[in-house]
Structures are given as structure tokens and as C-alpha cells.
Amino acid sequence: MTKFVFVTGGVVSSIGKGIVAASLGRLLKSRNYSVSILKLDPYINVDPGTMSPFQHGEVFVTDDGAETDLDLGHYERFTDTAMSRLNSVTTGSIYQSVLNKERRGDYEGGTVQVIPHITNEIKDRIKRVAKQATPDVLIIEIGGTVGDIESLPFLEAIRQFRKDVGRDNILYTHVTLMPWIPAAGEMKTKPTQHSVKELRSIGIQPDILVCRCDRPLSEGIKEKVSEFCDVPVEAVITSQDASSIYAVPLILEQEGLAQQVLKFMHLEQRRPDLTQWQALVHQLDHPSQTIEIALVGKYVQLSDAYLSVVESLQHAAVAQGIAVQIRWVNSEEIEAHGPDRYLADAAGIIVPGGFGIRGVDGKIAAIQYARDNQVPFLGLCLGMQCAVIEWARHIAGLEDANSAEFNPETRNPVINLLPEQQDVVDLGGTMRLGLYPCRLLPDTLASRLYPQETIVYERHRHRYEFNNAFRPLFLESGYVVSGTSPDGRLVEMIELPSHPFFIATQFHPEFRSRPNDPHPLFAGLVGACLADNGNNANHHDSTPAEPLVSEPLSS
């Protein structure tokens, strides 16, 4: 039978529940236990697909086309296990399902209430993942902070779940903050005590406490927390701040988190194999050199908006023994001041995805800069569409070329709506979403980057596509369409053979990169930057860059 581990958070938001859940998944998988992870989000949106990146960060897309929280990206990268739409649940999706049942008459005229109807729906979603994925352990992260009104139905549901599946099959882990007060010169346990008190008032007694802190917990502090929170002292786990999120599983392993989970759930204690993970973290901490790659976007004020792109660059860099420092470039600044001041000396340039016309001209200018100056370039989704517009305007002779998204009246819509999107009105969940095949053209850069493949599978999230009416003109002017849908109808990849490394994709390769298995396109970009003789590269051999992920861990 599947065992269930619930991960809650207290004191503050963004405390790192998602990283703790993903790290526990990694530790259990290293012991040959199968794992799946479910995120319960308390917001009323049905999914994050229509939310602003500034509000929510990146929207992570699964193989089956679900638009989900960025934590699912952490789950996939840490456990190397594909998630599905079942692994992401929001308050909005719960209420939508319950109201649909009410409209159909499923409740036979009964009064629909939070308890039992909403809580039962939440429990059913948890059981659905366990039934479909059949993992040895299902980890469930509850978004938000204990004490928030939005989380109450989820907390009540997981309280009831203990009775449904039996006490031996369930474990509650609470992630909390243990702040150091410099003026007092000591660590304070009171926030943790109050957070546990709040959780107990709901009827949940945590079995394990994971304490976020900036220094190790002393034995005295652990004893105090154990006494006041009624948790075994060995189940008070230190989660000290780390230079990289990938170091967190090793910290939690050293603290004995996995051993405590297995002990509580009466599962066999197995020896972990973390050899590859340890090598990954060692390489992260000891790069031979650092290169700087410019990421040109319009959401750069919030790096989480491009989280999977940043992580994919890091995976590719580690595999080649180096580090990558991101130069965050706001495309609107390029529009105002030109590309030279922002892109000079960058080893490479990435233009990632996005929506809307704001900042697009800056992205196009950055792409022209990369093309003219032979700087290695990778375009993703909107980045490919901007590359198409740039070529059309400056090489193919279509000076007014544009995307129908930005100018529906343009005479030369080199980017146009997909045929199946013509009559779509709703924005949420209606794009081309999920995993689709892409056929590679032989003897191209794309085919060299995927050397063993003729058909590759990548994840999509877009409504607009290359307009085939202009394909002959592009081919005649030197463009190469190196990847298409298997029927040849949809353009998925373009490249410039006259350039050292210029390739762009309609899909999102960043969603399939893994720490120990970097995506070929990102590996190719980093390799091209290293191969550059230094004309564009900015190397710092003696002083490594700051870690790519130095922000507080996302919840």
C-alpha cells in the first residue's frame, strides 16, 4: 500500500517546502523506493496558466499538457520522474469539480458544503494519484502557510486522511523557520512553537520538524524544540541555507530525514546511492571557470519567471565542468538604449518565452545583435518567433513583417495563429500544450545536438506558429527549418548554418532538462560559448560567479 507524507509550512511563506518535498523524494528514490509528489495550491485560479509571471513565477508544463506550479519542475528534476496533471491541484479546480457535480445533480439535492464535499474532493485527488502512479511513497506538499484561511480546507482534508488510510500509513512533516537574532546572539524557537501550536489546533500533530536556519541547530535547541513541540529530538531536522538547491538533499540526508520517515512508516531502511548527486554538488562548488550568458526577457525582475531556463543552463554547465552566470537583461531597456551596452562581451544570448507585445522589439534587437556579431544564440518559443520576425525584416525583405499576436492587421504575418486556435475565445488551458513529436532534418545542427534521434519529443506552450505561406521565402534566403511536426506541417526548429551556433525552437526544452542529464540544446549552447575564442566570451577563471540560484528557496 502507498504511504503518504504530508509537507506543511509555517511562520513565513517561501520557506522551502517544495525543495524539502523534492529532496525527500530524491532521498527515497536513492533507496529504490518509487515516489510521486503532489502539490495542493490554495489559490482559487483553476491553474496558473493565465497568472502573471510576476505574481506566480514560471508556469511549468507537464507531458500531458497541464499548466502547473513551478514546484512540479523541482519535483521532476530532483526525482527524475515525470509528473502529470494529477500532480497539481488548486482550490479553483476543486471547487470547479464540486460545482460541476452539483449542477449535474450528483449530490441529489443535498446542501453542498466545505465539509464534507470540498474535503472529500481533496482526498479523492490524493487517492487518484496514488492509484494511477502506485508509488511506494506519495509526498503531498500543501501550499501556503499554516494559519492562512485559504489553506484550511486542505489541512482539514489531510487531518481526516489519517483516519481514512490508517495512522501507520501517514506522516506529517512541518517546515518552519528558526531565526537567528543578532542583537540577542541566539536562535529563537518561539516562532516554531507557535506554528506547531496553530497546526495542533487544527488537529494535526507533526511527526517531523524541518527547521530552516542560517546555521546549524545546537543539541540544546533541538532538545528544546522536541520538548515544546512533542516531536522526538532525532526528528528535529536542520535545513541550513545552502549555496545551491541541489545541496539540500545531502544536508537532509546527513540530518537523517529519510531514516526518520522510513522509521515512522515502518519501511525497510535501505542504503542510499547518492554517488551521482554528490558528484553533481561537488562540481557545482568547484567549476573550472565561469562564463556569462545574457538572458533577454521582460520578466527579469523575478528570476523565478525563467526558473527552468536557469536550471537548464546550470545542468549544462556542470556537465562541462564550468559555471554559468546569468546576465539579466530587460528587453525594454534594449528598446530604450540599444543592445550594445547590455550584450557586449556576453558569451551567449538566450531569448526565452513570453506573451504580449511589450518588450518584443528589444528581443528582436538582441537577436539581430547575436546574428550580426556571431554570438551563440538559443531562442525558446517566443524567442523563435522573434528570430523569424528579425530575419523577415532584415534579410528576407519584409520590413513590416510581424506576428499576428502583436499586429493582427500586418500584411506579412510570418507568425500566425495555429489553425485550431482560430475560433478559440477562452485563454486558460486552450493553447497547444504538452508533449509532441518533432522530426529532425538530417545534416543540421539540430540533428547533431540530438545525435541518436530522428524523432524527439518536447513540451509545448503556445498559440501562434510559423506561417507556412512564408516558408519558401525563408528557405530561399538561407534559413534552415531543421525540425518539424512528423507530417511536416508545423515548424518546430529553425537555425542558421552560416552562424557558429544559432538555433531556436517553438517548444520549451527547459522543461525536460535534468541535473544529471542536461538537455542537448542547452548543452550545445554552453559548448558553443566555450568553443568561442573569447571574441564575445567573458571569462572569470579565478573568481567563480555567484550561484545561479541564490534567492530564498521557493515554497
From Swiss-Prot:
Keywords: ATP-binding, Glutamine amidotransferase, Ligase, Magnesium, Metal-binding, Nucleotide-binding, Pyrimidine biosynthesis. The active site is at C381, H508, E510. It catalyses: UTP + L-glutamine + ATP + H2O = CTP + L-glutamate + ADP + phosphate + 2 H(+); L-glutamine + H2O = L-glutamate + NH4(+); UTP + NH4(+) + ATP = CTP + ADP + phosphate + 2 H(+). Residues 536-555 are annotated as: Disordered. Residues 299-535 form the Glutamine amidotransferase type-1 domain. L-glutamine binds at G354, L382, G383, M384, Q385, E405, R463. ATP binds at S14, I15, G16, K17, G18, I19, D71, A242. Residues 1-267 are annotated as: Amidoligase domain. UTP binds at S13, K188, T189, K190, P191, T192, Q193, K224. Its EC number is 6.3.4.2. Mg(2+) binds at D71, E141. Allosterically activated by GTP, when glutamine is the substrate; GTP has no effect on the reaction when ammonia is the substrate. The allosteric effector GTP functions by stabilizing the protein conformation that binds the tetrahedral intermediate(s) formed during glutamine hydrolysis. Inhibited by the product CTP, via allosteric rather than competitive inhibition. Pathway: Pyrimidine metabolism; CTP biosynthesis via de novo pathway; CTP from UDP: step 2/2. GO terms for molecular function: ATP binding; CTP synthase activity; glutaminase activity; identical protein binding; metal ion binding. It is an enzyme of class 6 (ligase). CTP binds at S13, D148, I149, E150, K188, T189, K190, P191, T192, Q193, K224. GO terms for biological process: 'de novo' CTP biosynthetic process; pyrimidine nucleobase biosynthetic process. One of its GO terms (cellular component) is cytosol. Belongs to the CTP synthase family. CTPSs have evolved a hybrid strategy for distinguishing between UTP and CTP. The overlapping regions of the product feedback inhibitory and substrate sites recognize a common feature in both compounds, the triphosphate moiety. To differentiate isosteric substrate and product pyrimidine rings, an additional pocket far from the expected kinase/ligase catalytic site, specifically recognizes the cytosine and ribose portions of the product inhibitor. Homotetramer. Catalyzes the ATP-dependent amination of UTP to CTP with either L-glutamine or ammonia as the source of nitrogen. Regulates intracellular CTP levels through interactions with the four ribonucleotide triphosphates. This is CTP synthase. It comes from Acaryochloris marina (strain MBIC 11017).
